[in-house]
Amino acid sequence: MLAGCQPGYMSTASTNEQASAAGPPPAADRASYRDVLGVGEFRVIFTADIVSMLGNIVAEVALTVLVYEQTRSPALAALVLGLSFMPYLIGGALLGATADRLPARRVLVGCDLASAVLVGSMVIPGIPVPGLLALLFANGLIAPVYQGVRSALLPQVLPPGPRYVLGRSLMRMVAQSAQIVGFGAGGLLLAILSPRGALTADALSFVASALVLRFGTALRPVRAARSGSMARDSLAGLRGALAHRPTRRILLFSWLVPACAVAPEALAAPYATHIGLPARAAGFLLMGIPAGTIAADVIAARFLSSRRQRRIIVAAGLLTFAPLTAFAASPGLGLAVVLLVISGLGSAWAAGMDGLLIDTAPSGLRNRTLALAGAGLMFTQGAGFALWGIAGQYASLTVVIPVAAIAGALAVVTLRPHPRP
């Protein structure tokens, strides 16, 4: 499960604001997905990202089945998914300086090859379950490095502005779609191959991604040589980003809002049984938010100017949570899916936050701030899954989901970005 945000600055000239409100955004503030995909290097990164993302998801599915077949333990099988989130905290904190210390292409290719070796090692016959989990955890440490370096590379391939926002939009849409396609592909592979066969195919996919990146991206030198250890440099960058108040607010908004928004997904299976349906009906619920999110990204990134993207951040954030309060009334499956799609539409706030983070990050720390944003998002989403899942065991789902919605709305209002004068 892999799985991104920021605000913009409004002009104080009222005449400019009126002109913007009255007519379409100027050409300089518009771009299309065709423009973005017309950049060859972005296409390469985009393709490799799809392959790596699907590979990680398929690995989780196959390894979950493999662990369960060996142990018949639901707890250990569930631990596989938990371990996919935990390394983000460690990797993001201790390896966040990678983007500033090593050439991006070298890191991305190295990450894919390391993942190929680790996933390939999982197919060794007779390897004990603790060994499988250790390999999964090690592979999980690579993911935040890969995503952080890729995030830092993107503004160099797509300069900050409309194209960058659209590029980030495409990445988010792929992340949402990969959740659905990846689990389906994993199930299909397991229907054709054994779990070890699926893992072998996954290892080969990482090799393919490495080759695409090696021959499709430019070798960019690092901006400046740095001394000291990687961990110390990473922690210094972490402190620097969080010490900058505007950046800290953006990061906290981008982490806490999604952490609350995942509550209905974390409780999808229990909610399905709560309304009298089999647990497998959770699949319909799980499609709701990703569907809304994809639509929101297309609308916000493609059809709204940068200024309007940033103006709707708070309203869109509140839209994320308003529909979730209706779960207090135990809506049926059809209405619940509609509510979740509307909640997903609220994720339009992310388009505005993308540009804002780029504009706000402290000088010299942009790469590490972008890496931190991605790692923190994945970790807090995982923590949100765990928190709301545990809460659902001890309290009614008709209470837990609305409480998560209220907490999320409070985060939106409390951490709302302040535009520059």
Show which residues each predicted segment covers.
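Alpha-helical transmembrane-bundle signature of multi-pass membrane transport and export proteins
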Residues: 2-421
